[in-house]
């Protein structure tokens, strides 16, 4: 992508409305723009990051055996009345009526709808276990939306829903998502700690929040410091192994970890003082097991091996991609801007032409740009006529992991400079070596 033809409206000054680092940097880097309170447009740079986050989420959901579908954003109020949540959910749910005066709602979550899909299609235990997920925009009318897309009214959510014949089967499905979430966050460059959580309006009796530690987090968290060094389940994790996944779950829940809502001061004080960690954190995922809370009132049942009908046991599992993006920034930035993990960076490399119009610089940059694109890399080519300082500031602000800098003096010697955004380390190398480093 040539920067001269790209839409990336950079802000030079810090926006007054931004209270936290991620909101400020997302606005300055031209990733998002606010349309109304708590509602944002994702501009091209932000959309590229969001798409890469979603791709990793999809890969790990699929790896764990979940199956993707797509459900509508507008839902019938009748389904929510059937489950008993229509009146109980509160003012966060946006209620509307269509032209036939039928009550509808803009879905804040999808337990009722996915249960309706299940009950109309699945009749036998032989079709279980089943886990369905989708990635969709949702709306909750927050009283006080703040911090940009960290806590917005319209947001994107990956929500998965599992169906099992027994509680034991449902707990295995829960453990699958537990392990999948640990893998997902690690691939996004985050260390998330699972903490026992309140079930809230979703309901149920087993729930964990996944929290990353950050000074700007809304939650106060208390945990054993060893969580920071725990090994993440590997790519070869057997998601069909009941014992293997139970071992992962037991390991990650064996030490004390709780948000302020579930904090037990006495239990935390029992942790050796040198091992206690109290900090602030950001919730990036939430999983629930709620048994037959929805299947019973909505009649979601299957015929079991005994020939009798059984209400299915359910769980739900949420990750907010539009919340994850600012969370990654909160965890990875410096005074100059964002430092993206390579897995979600909008571009792999930015090629900076220090003197546009100089034939040697132009030819060198075109050569590198073409070679990296041919190798399948996402490349941003700064071919603008901005001053050198502006080019460097822009590259640092948007956080591309690698900068390849071509100036007249270096190019005359057949060389370019390569800068690592995270460490700031610079290395001069031949043009061929620079290309080979990133196409190998």
From Swiss-Prot:
It is an enzyme of class 6 (ligase). Gene3D superfamilies: Anticodon-binding domain, Bira Bifunctional Protein, Domain 2. GO terms for molecular function: ATP binding; proline-tRNA ligase activity. SUPFAM superfamilies: Class II aaRS ABD-related, Class II aaRS and biotin synthetases. One of its GO terms (cellular component) is cytosol. Keywords: Aminoacyl-tRNA synthetase, ATP-binding, Cytoplasm, Ligase, Nucleotide-binding, Protein biosynthesis. It comes from the Bacteria. It is found in: Cytoplasm. It catalyses: tRNA(Pro) + L-proline + ATP = L-prolyl-tRNA(Pro) + AMP + diphosphate. One of its GO terms (biological process) is prolyl-tRNA aminoacylation. Its main location: cytoplasm. Its EC number is 6.1.1.15. Pfam families: HGTP_anticodon, tRNA-synt_2b. NCBIfam families: PRK12325.1, proS_fam_II. Homodimer. PANTHER family: MITOCHONDRIAL RIBOSOME PROTEIN L39/PROLYL-TRNA LIGASE FAMILY MEMBER, PROLINE--TRNA LIGASE. Belongs to the class-II aminoacyl-tRNA synthetase family. ProS type 2 subfamily. Catalyzes the attachment of proline to tRNA(Pro) in a two-step reaction: proline is first activated by ATP to form Pro-AMP and then transferred to the acceptor end of tRNA(Pro). This is Proline--tRNA ligase. The lineage of its organism: Bacteria, Pseudomonadati, Pseudomonadota, Alphaproteobacteria, Hyphomicrobiales.
């Amino acid at each position: 992508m040539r920067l001269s033809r790209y839409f990336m409206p950079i802000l030079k000054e810090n926006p007054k409305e931004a209270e936290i680092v991620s909101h400020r940097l997302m606005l300055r880097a031209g990733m998002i723009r606010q349309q109304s309170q708590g509602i944002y447009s994702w501009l091209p740079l932000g959309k590229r990051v969001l798409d890469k986050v979603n791709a990793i989420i999809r890969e790990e959901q699929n790896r764990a055996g979940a199956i993707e579908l797509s459900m509508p954003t507008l839902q019938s109020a009748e389904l929510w009345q059937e489950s008993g949540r229509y009146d109980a959910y509160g003012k966060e749910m946006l209620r509307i009526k269509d032209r036939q005066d039928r009550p509808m709602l803009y879905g804040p979550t999808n337990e009722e709808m996915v249960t309706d899909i299940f009950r109309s299609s699945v009749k036998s235990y032989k079709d279980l276990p089943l886990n369905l997920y989708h990635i969709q925009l949702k709306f909750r009318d927050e009283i006080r939306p703040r911090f940009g897309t960290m806590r917005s009214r319209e947001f994107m959510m990956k929500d998965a829903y599992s169906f099992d014949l027994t509680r034991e089967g449902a707990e295995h499905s829960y453990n699958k998502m537990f392990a999948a979430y640990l893998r997902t966050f690690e691939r996004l460059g985050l260390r998330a700690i699972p903490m026992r959580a309140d079930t809230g309006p979703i309901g149920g009796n087993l729930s964990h929040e996944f929290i990353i530690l950050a000074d700007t987090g809304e939650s106060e968290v208390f945990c054993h410091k060893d969580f920071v060094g725990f090994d993440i389940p590997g790519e070869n994790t057997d998601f069909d192994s009941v014992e293997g996944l139970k071992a992962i779950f037991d390991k990650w829940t064996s030490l004390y970890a709780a948000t302020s809502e579930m904090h037990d001061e006495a239990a935390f004080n029992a942790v050796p003082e040198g091992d206690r960690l109290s900090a602030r954190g950001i919730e990036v995922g939430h999983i629930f097991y709620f048994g037959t809370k929805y299947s019973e009132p909505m009649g979601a049942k299957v015929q079991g091996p005994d020939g009798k009908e059984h209400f299915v046991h359910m769980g739900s599992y949420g990750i907010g991609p539009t919340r994850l993006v600012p969370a990654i920034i909160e965890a990875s930035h410096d005074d100059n801007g964002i430092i993206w993990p390579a897995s979600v960076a909008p571009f792999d490399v930015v090629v900076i032409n220090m003197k546009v119009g100089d034939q040697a610089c132009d030819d060198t940059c075109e050569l590198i740009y073409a070679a990296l694109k041919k190798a399948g890399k996402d490349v941003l080519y700064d071919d603008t006529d901005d001053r050198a300082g502006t080019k460097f500031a822009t590259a640092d602000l948007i956080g591309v992991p690698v900068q390849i800098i071509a100036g007249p003096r270096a190019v005359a010697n057949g060389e370019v400079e390569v800068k690592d955004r995270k460490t700031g380390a610079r290395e001069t190398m031949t043009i061929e070596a620079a290309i080979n480093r990133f196409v190998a």
